[in-house]
């Protein structure tokens, strides 16, 4: 009789624990820009359709999102290999995409963070110009740019070539200064125009600046007819995105190791750029773009996923 009671108690305890796991709310965090809002919406809707309870918080700066995840306030964040390598772990060694991923996976595991498989898209920095202007000047790469600028500055000393960028890149130790030194670019203080990253694209489109710092998966590059210059000396690090999950959450949900693979496998540069364009150019909401992406790839069986908590 006692053995039967003990068995029943153990069974009830198991059911109670399972119920707690099912009732757990997964906290998804995202950063300030369009791409992050889309990725968090995709993740939230994908998880909700599979019976998980989620909340979403977007609009976080990179360091704030990282700190929130390390302290246990966020469970899932889409992170970039370059951000973890350079900003969080202070590694300035030049690594290729695969080596970058292996290094951050190892380093962040010590912080209680688990990197899932990386996507194929690389949202790194790049320099861009209006396509027509770049074609006229014969500029395909950053080295071409350096050559043309040197020729023009020699022919017309004191000439300006306005360069638009966000304030962070202008001041960060792996930003404007080291890049200019590597390529032999010479910009004066009067050449530099600091502005919100989103305004750089409009300034380029309207020919208000000669050159701009952009992100390679931004949807406005194609629509605004901007040429991304080849980083032929490989200055910019790789920024491949991947879901990063707290280790405690992974221990409770080992299925997460492969659950997101259908999403990860479908995200490349062209796909991410097209998704971003639907928000930035077509003015669709990140939630709608996410739902359409999931439906297109048959990752929602009836298209009735929730919209992913508070934005």
Curated annotation (Swiss-Prot):
GO cellular component terms attached to this protein's record: ATP-binding cassette (ABC) transporter complex; periplasmic space
InterPro entries referenced in this protein's UniProt entry, alphabetically: ABC_Gly_betaine_transp_sub-bd
Compartment list: Periplasm
BP GO annotations: amino-acid betaine transport; cellular hyperosmotic salinity response; glycine betaine transport
GO molecular function, one term: carnitine transmembrane transporter activity
Name of a matching Pfam family: OpuAC
Keywords: Periplasm, Signal, Transport
Signal peptide: 1-23
Function: Binds glycine-betaine.
Family per similarity comment: Belongs to the OsmX family.
Entry protein name: Glycine-betaine-binding protein
